[in-house]
């Protein structure tokens, strides 16, 4: 059985499956219009890391580690609404967490956070807010269910695997690789510079706005739409887009540039794809 068949059998009622595949209709959550327009305003700038920290960095009820105790964080959870934000230290906010289900350890420079509590019906799981310092260079998240937000991260790698939930990465710089595996849910990237994005979406939309992709990048969607506004110009990228059932909307001749080292392969089984570019002429 293919992974698309599996997710349809597990997550989606039969009637909804036919409406999605037959009409290429995605209603998992709010998305931009097909023309790629969004409500987001992101400055066309190079990312820098300043020392202004989120107010959530207040120790309060939190487990903390100094910034020099680890350079990586690994997060495993059954269900939680996860928020990773910039902080001067590693901080796990415990205000709304069940301490019996929470484990935080530091091993060989890796902070391991495990939260085993199941989600209550009609909820997204407990809020799991984690502060990460600029010394943190690698983020790994594995979660059964829940939304994941990463803001103002500057490091080497991000690896996220989620069965059901949305993923949002904003105002971040990833220098080596960013791997996203999402079975049911959407993925959003805003105002970021990412090298080596590999996004595999089974059922959900992928939205990219004012984000520079460098190196080799792959965007795979089984059922869903791709709303793509890359930072820069068409000449900055070599783009190969393939849609089996659906439409590709782009005002530029993508075949003109085949020499850029920054390559983007887009593959959609059933869905639409819009491609645009964000630069000083249209900011």
Predicted regions and their residues:
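Positively charged n-region of N-terminal signal peptides that target proteins for export
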Residues: 1-6
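Hydrophobic membrane-insertion alpha-helices, especially the h-region
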Residues: 8-24
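Short linear S-[DN]-x-LW-Φ motif typified by the pepsin-like aspartic protease active-site region
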Residues: 25-116, 123, 127-140, 147-161, ...
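Short, surface-exposed interaction patches in beta-rich subdomains
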Residues: 110, 116-119, 167-182, 186-283
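Short amphipathic alpha-helical "recognition" segments used for binding
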Residues: 7-10, 45, 248
């Amino acid at each position: 059985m293919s992974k698309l068949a599996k997710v349809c059998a597990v997550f989606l009622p039969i009637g909804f499956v036919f409406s999605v595949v037959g009409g290429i209709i995605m209603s998992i959550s709010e998305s931009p219009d097909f023309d790629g327009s969004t409500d987001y305003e992101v400055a066309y700038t190079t990312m820098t890391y300043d020392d202004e920290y989120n107010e959530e960095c207040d120790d309060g009820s939190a487990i903390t580690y100094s910034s020099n105790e680890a350079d990586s964080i690994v997060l495993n959870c059954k269900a939680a609404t996860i928020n990773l934000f910039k902080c001067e230290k590693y901080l796990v906010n415990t205000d709304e967490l069940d301490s019996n289900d929470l484990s935080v350890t530091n091993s060989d420079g890796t902070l391991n956070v495990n939260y085993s509590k199941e989600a209550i019906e009609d909820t997204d799981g407990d809020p799991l807010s984690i502060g990460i310092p600029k010394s943190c260079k690698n983020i790994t998240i594995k979660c059964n269910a829940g939304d994941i937000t990463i803001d103002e991260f500057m490091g080497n790698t991000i690896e996220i695997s989620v069965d059901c939930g949305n993923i949002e990465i904003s105002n971040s710089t990833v220098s080596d690789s960013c791997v996203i595996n999402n079975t049911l849910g959407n993925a959003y990237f805003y105002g970021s510079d990412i090298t080596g994005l590999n996004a595999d979406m089974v059922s959900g939309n992928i939205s990219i706005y004012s984000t520079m992709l460098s190196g080799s990048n792959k965007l795979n969607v089984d059922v869903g739409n791709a709303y793509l506004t890359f930072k820069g110009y068409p000449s900055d990228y070599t783009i190969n887009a393939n849609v089996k059932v659906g439409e590709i909307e782009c005002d530029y001749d993508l075949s003109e540039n085949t020499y850029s080292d920054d390559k983007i392969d887009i593959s959609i089984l059933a869905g639409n794809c819009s491609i645009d570019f964000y630069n000083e002429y249209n900011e």
